[in-house]
Amino acid sequence: MPTLNYSVAVSGLGGNIAQNIPRSADGGSIREVSLPVGKAGTLTTRTDVNTGQITMASGGHGITTGANVDIYWDGGVQYNATVGTVVGTTVPFDGGEGDDLPTNGTDVVVSVRQLISLDLDGDSLTLLAINQKYSNNLETAISHITFYDSGPNEIAELDLQANTPQVFDIIGGATNIFTGNPIVNAFASNGSTSDAATLQLLWLQDSTP
């Protein structure tokens, strides 16, 4: 029976709280996936809340026609947008989800979504930990991950703070946002233009009765 351990530590104001918490279940798994840097640009056309055009900062941006991307800006992210016909530094897009696009002239980061194969049944999940890890401890970029069933229908989506693990201790009382059909894959991206990231996932789940 696999076991995961996580720790909670809070200190200050003359007090200290520290606890190691072990969790066990019938099964579990791990994923570590490299996420390349995003590319800088400017929103130069805002047609509606999820349609527009970005002018990339350089011609070697690598964003291609038909790519599936997440778009980041200060205070928001729109995920699962589809890129139209790319011409030079001009990148049109449509169909994103999440936050409404900002105003014209806003600096943005365009990041191609990376596929992560999973075998995760949220209904039997007991603990899930996730972290967007950067070697640069000063990195502050927000990143994003979306979980899907085989439909593909969205099961859950999360914003990820740089180098800040999130732990869903479901057996310990945390809300389970991953319930529904089994999760077969996720798409994640990197909101930083300077530092590559490693997405880390650890989870435990009990066997279905």
Which stretches of residues belong to each language-model region?
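A short beta-strand element within beta-rich, extracytoplasmic domains
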Residues: 69-71, 123-134
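Short, surface-exposed beta-strand/strand-loop-strand elements in extracellular ectodomains
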Residues: 131-158
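Extended, low-complexity, turn-rich repeat/linker tracts enriched in Gly/Pro/Ser/Thr and Asp/Glu
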Residues: 76-78, 133-143, 191-195
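Short, well-ordered loop/turn sites that connect or cap secondary structure elements
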Residues: 62-65, 125, 160
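N-terminal low-complexity, intrinsically disordered "leader/linker" segments enriched in small/polar
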Residues: 1-42, 113-125
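Small/polar beta-strand repeat architecture
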Residues: 37-113
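C-terminal interaction-tip segments
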Residues: 1-18, 189-209
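Noncatalytic modules at the cell exterior or secretory-pathway interfaces
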Residues: 172-198
